[in-house]
Every structure is written in C-alpha cells, then in structure tokens.
Amino acid sequence: SKHVAQWLKTAGTQSVVFISSTSVYQQTNGEWVSENDADTPQNITTNILLEAEQNILEAGPAVAILRSSGIYGPGRGHLFRQFMNGTAAIEGDGKRFLNMVHLDDLVEAIILALELVGRHGIYNITDDEPGTQLNFFKWLSETTGRPMPPFVPEPNPSTAKRRITNKRVSNKLIKKTFGLLHNYPTFREGFTQELDRLANGKTRQPLSP
C-alpha cells in the first residue's frame, strides 16, 4: 500500500476510492460502531487493512476510504447459497448480527465518492438494518417455505479461521455526506430480487464473497 500511496501522490489524480472492510471493527457485544471505532486491532489482517487505509488516506486531499460490509447480490452471498443448498446452520443462539450491502449500492457509493470530489475521509458502506442470523434465516424460511437451518454451537474462538465479531455497523456518515439512498435498504429487498431471479430460471448460484 505504501508504493500505491506514493504513486498516487505523484499521479495527480483528482479523486481516489479505496475499498476496505468493516472487519476492522472487532467488537463482540452487538454494539453500534461508527468510523471512529476501529482503534483496537486484534489480528494481522486488521492491522494490514488499517495501515493500508492510512497510507492511501495520506496520498492526497480527495481520498475516500469505503469500509464495505458483506457484499451480496447476483453471484454473491454465501449464507444465501448455503440456505438454498440445505447446508446452512445457525451458530449459537442466532443473535449475532450480520452486516450486509447489496453490490449495486456499493457501486453507487463508489460512483458518488468519485464524482463528489473533496469528501476526504473514511466511510462505512452497509445497509440500513443489521439483522441477526436468526432473523435472516427466519425470513428466508418464511419466504421460500423451506425449513429453518439447524442450530449448531458457536465456533471456538481459539480454532476459528477468523475472529468472531458481533457488531452493528452504522451508515449514517456516508448517507449524510454523499446523500446516498440505498436501493436495497435491508437484506429483504435484495434477497427478494435474488429469489425472483432464481424463480425466473436464472439459475446461476451465488458465490462466496
């Protein structure tokens, strides 16, 4: 990221958008988090992301860092794929929050950030309503008539591939700064479209983000 930042400083670009991740937030108690709450990195990946953000942010006066939550839409969405394949499971009591954003809304945010030059800073891009695992699968079950996934124990933090977090990511800043209006304000609108797409014979299964 240092080499990229150095190149940006000499390239004279008018605006820069860097896509980061809401995984920089390591909170575990279901609390709301904003752009100022990523100050306690817990692992190598988070450290690398935060360092990259800072390097790019210092590359010029018109840099927007977009911290994206889990992206879904045509071709994306591993939990949806698991549900449709009958391999999904609800971890623990199902009350851990999921933060998601539709691909189209992410693209819209990128375009706005490029066009509205001068909105320098870090912004979360996520939908309006974090939902729990339980509510997500309950909605899918009720909408499709398929059975609910089984409950399984929470992953052991000491053996999990990545840190298990539980937080609700706020999108207030990006909406206020860019006037962003989500086409898919919650997962319901987005996955209703995905279910319609599959029902109309467009059977390309979603892939993992």
Where are these predicted regions, by residue range?
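Conserved C-terminal active-site "lid" loop/helix of NAD(P)H-dependent oxidoreductases
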Residues: 138, 158-181
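Amphipathic terminal alpha-helices
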Residues: 186-209
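NAD(P)-cofactor binding segment of oxidoreductase domains
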Residues: 1-18, 51
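Catalytic helix-loop patch of NAD(P)-dependent Rossmann-fold dehydrogenases
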Residues: 29-65
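Mid/C-terminal beta-alpha module of Rossmann-like enzyme folds, strongest
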Residues: 109-110, 116-159, 204-208
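Glycine/proline-rich active-site loop of Rossmann-fold NAD(P)-dependent oxidoreductases
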Residues: 47-50, 59, 71-82, 112-123, ...
